[in-house]
């Protein structure tokens, strides 16, 4: 099964993945809005630096937003959002947990197996935090990184976080003049 958030960039990424793996049309693919990126309210679409390097550190009187917990970040975004669209930590973490658990439970009910899921950096970081808070200390996920989770007996287990090895192999192939 393949699942992505319903945002354009995850749909595009999933299309590339399925095409490269030869799975386009071969496995079911659907969207799930619960695994969307965090809603940054009035900062959605803005330059990340404005929010993370400017506004939030000033609101919390810290030098670096990395000093803030995910909960503090979420609540800070709610505080500075002028649209009322930003989600509280409770709403955000519940949405993300429900979305990924639904995918896992559906797969489990079908007899198990693997799913390809394309989501977003802050969303994946939040899910990892909900599984193991210590795992996100100092964590910054690169775009296109691969995180592998297992789901067994009603719980997620982290197998790999932010793996970039396949991109390094691809970069070497491109350097060698190969198109594929």
Language-model features, listed with the residues they occupy:
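Short glycine/proline- and acidic residue-enriched helix-loop micro-motifs
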Residues: 57-91
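Glycine-rich phosphate-binding loop signature in dinucleotide/nucleotide-binding domains
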Residues: 103-113
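Domain-level recognition of soluble alpha/beta enzyme cores
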Residues: 70-71, 79, 132-157
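Phosphate-coordination/substrate-recognition cap region in phosphate-metabolizing enzymes
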Residues: 1-65
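Acidic, His/Gly-rich catalytic cores of divalent-metal-dependent hydrolytic chemistry
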Residues: 159-180
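Active-site metal-binding loops of divalent metal-dependent hydrolases
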Residues: 121-122, 164
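Short beta-strand scaffold positions
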Residues: 4-5, 94, 118-119
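Generic beta-sheet signal
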Residues: 111-121
